[in-house]
Amino acid sequence: MQHSKSYRKAAAAIDRSKLYTPAEAVKLAKETTSVKFDATVEVAMRLGVDPRKADQMVRGTVNLPHGTGKTARVIVFAAGAKAEEAVAAGADEVGTDELVARIQGGWLEFDAAIATPDQMAKIGRIARILGPRGLMPNPKTGTVTMNVAKAVSDIKGGKIAFRVDKHSNLHLIIGKASFSEAQLVDNYAAVLDEVLRAKPSAAKGKYLKKVTLTTTMGPGVPVDPNVVKNLQEGSAEG
């Protein structure tokens, strides 16, 4: 793969043999973004789990203190009073059978889906579409609920879901390059806290194997996975 001159210049600023503290990594990621738009900042984590085993699945949600920099488009499967609550809370689309039909027809212009429990049988018809994209409502992530208003406002406010993929990796957005270093470190700390909290008891050996911070089309910055406390100061205490 041929990288651009700006990418190669950015990559040269990163010492591949070093593990950076979160504060250092955020600073470098912001400095090495080479695109002309406001790049997305993402953290990738390699976990010491076998996701093929049910007792080693890692999933959960995290409330990013400063959001993702993007307002999520949220749809809600609900009827009656619950549908009205969802609309009032700011849901982008609300419906039942007609929403299912639109998705069956190929419409996927949303970032999160919420459902009341009574709608789950209908949503089963589109599980094959939503599941692989991480969009299937699930009680564990608070997206199958009677409290649709809270679920909508949480997601709009920066709550994101995470789930380990079949290669034992997690990918989470922690903001935009335009965020301050402190905001990105705060969001990273929130993500790290929830991922550590989600560690399965069946997981043996080193849990957090590798952490990399990247921006859109930018080089990866290796982060020390052992730095948990004092993130702003970059202390290596864990």
From Swiss-Prot:
Pfam families: Ribosomal_L1 (PF00687). It comes from the Bacteria. GO terms for cellular component: large ribosomal subunit. InterPro entries: Ribosom_uL1_bac-type, Ribosomal_uL1, Ribosomal_uL1-like, Ribosomal_uL1/biogenesis, Ribosomal_uL1_3-a/b-sand, Ribosomal_uL1_CS. One of its GO terms (biological process) is regulation of translation. GO terms for molecular function: rRNA binding; structural constituent of ribosome; tRNA binding. Keywords: Repressor, Ribonucleoprotein, Ribosomal protein, RNA-binding, rRNA-binding, Translation regulation, tRNA-binding. PROSITE patterns: RIBOSOMAL_L1. CDD domains: Ribosomal_L1. Part of the 50S ribosomal subunit. Belongs to the universal ribosomal protein uL1 family. Binds directly to 23S rRNA. The L1 stalk is quite mobile in the ribosome, and is involved in E site tRNA release. This is Large ribosomal subunit protein uL1. It comes from Salinispora arenicola (strain CNS-205).
